[in-house]
Amino acid sequence: MAQGTLYIVSAPSGAGKSSLIQALLKTQPLYDTQVSVSHTTRAPRPGEVHGEHYFFVNHDEFKTMIGREAFLEHAEVFGNYYGTSRETTEQVLATGVDVFLDIDWQGAQQIREKMPQARSIFILPPSKIELDRRLRGRGQDSEEVIAKRMAQAVAEMSHYAEYDYLIVNDDFDTALSDLKTIIRAERLRMSRQKQRHDALISKLLAD
């Protein structure tokens, strides 16, 4: 069976990364594409299901996993830990399913060190004006918060060249089509096609 591909997807807040990934998943069967389910030490929110939205663990369990080098990447955010399990990810990839990781550039660097075969995609907004409009979309944040989020977005965008692919999300449907094209092209790589069509190739080359 052909090995699945691990996709790293990063973008500044407001670029539409999560919306694009969710739209992609609606067009792909579960046996083809999945989003990685992270481990976290934060408490479940209403409606969240263990193993579906997150794997909820306590701080001691998480630190034990760090000690065992069980994570492809991990980070602390507002006092809670988040991490991507190496074992879980490798098990899914082994079934031929492509796995998407929605992470920032720092997490992407950690994963590249451990799984250099991963493919990475960076998503940019079409302009700073549009990014500012999207960041203000909720209408709940102060000017100070907006300015801070914009500064964080610029810092994130400065790492775009570290990625394999670049998508500019100006028109959502076009950006989604670009994302699908990347996935399709990766599935047609020689390494995957040789595994997928091994029996056919053997018959075609037989005397």
UniProtKB/Swiss-Prot annotation:
Protein name: Guanylate kinase
Domain Guanylate kinase-like: 4-184
GO molecular function: ATP binding; guanylate kinase activity
UniProt enzyme class: transferase
Entry-linked PROSITE patterns: GUANYLATE_KINASE_1, GUANYLATE_KINASE_2
Catalytic activity as recorded in UniProt: GMP + ATP = GDP + ADP; dZMP + ATP = dZDP + ADP
Known EC number: 2.7.4.8
InterPro entries given in the database record: GK/Ca_channel_bsu (IPR008145), Guanylate_kin-like_dom (IPR008144), Guanylate_kinase (IPR017665), Guanylate_kinase_CS (IPR020590), P-loop_NTPase (IPR027417)
Sequence similarity: Belongs to the guanylate kinase family.
Listed SUPFAM superfamilies: P-loop containing nucleoside triphosphate hydrolases
Cellular component, GO annotation: cytosol
Pathway where this protein functions: Purine metabolism
Keywords associated with the record: ATP-binding, Cytoplasm, Kinase, Nucleotide-binding, Transferase
Binding-site positions, ATP: A11, P12, S13, G14, A15, G16, K17, S18
UniProt key word Nuclease: no
Function: Essential for recycling GMP and indirectly, cGMP. (Microbial infection) Catalyzes the phosphorylation of dZMP to dZDP, when the bacterium is infected by a phage that produces the substrate for the synthesis of dZTP (2- amino-2'-deoxyadenosine 5'-triphosphate), which is then used by the phage as a DNA polymerase substrate.
